[in-house]
Amino acid sequence: MSNLSMRAIGLLVLTLMACLDICPAHAEMNDFPDRLDNFGFSLLERLEVSETKNFLISPASIEFALGMAWTGAAGETAQAMGRLLGINSSSREAALSELTDLRATLESPGSGITLKVANAAWIDDSVQLNKSFSTDLAATFKTKLESVRFRDSNTISRINDWVSDATGGKITRLLENPPVPPMFLANAIYFHASWNTPFQKQSTQPQPFYPASGANLTVQMMQQKGLFPYAKGRGYQVVALPYVDNRFAMYCFLPDHGVNALVEALKKTSWSDLS
């Protein structure tokens, strides 16, 4: 623990991670949270990180969307997707169970926290889904299944309306053009919670912020002093800001030498080292 008053002296990267308490029914699945974390770090490695633009990724969202696709795969395709997602069980039923546990855990976030998970699949009306595929999507992911005519311009509005509703209006337009047949899969995760230690509005003040370009910007910056989990790694500092109930936290990384160097450092870090 450290008494920390944090000022922006470099490029600040904000990462929201969920501290999940998943207890799968199958003993071989007990490392699933670690494998999901590894998927997130592996995904971060492969992104083209910009030093000048903000970006946001949700490994859990991508895991759900690819998990839905994996549910309908078979043979070498299913094996390759399973390795990517950290689904290494020879039992399809056990793998579906751990994905169900992940969704159920996220849907039970605790008091004072809003966390909604929504999955949907739009299928072109020229295609008939396999019955078992439809059943698994509904049972494992609670997927909304809808048969539509992809070439119909109204399909864009229907999908965008679903996205807007699932994200509480935060994302109102996902598609500009009709999706490519035969299927369009989507996941949305909506999170809202108060800080465990609230920031005081009157404490927000103009402070210097130094982006990777070397410029000196003045921005409105929240601030407070208190005891928070803190660590210093190779090439970065990190502080955890817990949300109410202490089950979720925002981890704020301050890189020593820019975002790309931070990503390189995180390649050598496991999430258990930070949490």
Which residues does each PLM region occupy?
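Short amphipathic alpha-helical leader/targeting segments
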Residues: Q79-M81, F199, F228, E264
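Short non-domain terminal segments
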Residues: A18-L20, N30, Q207, N246, ...
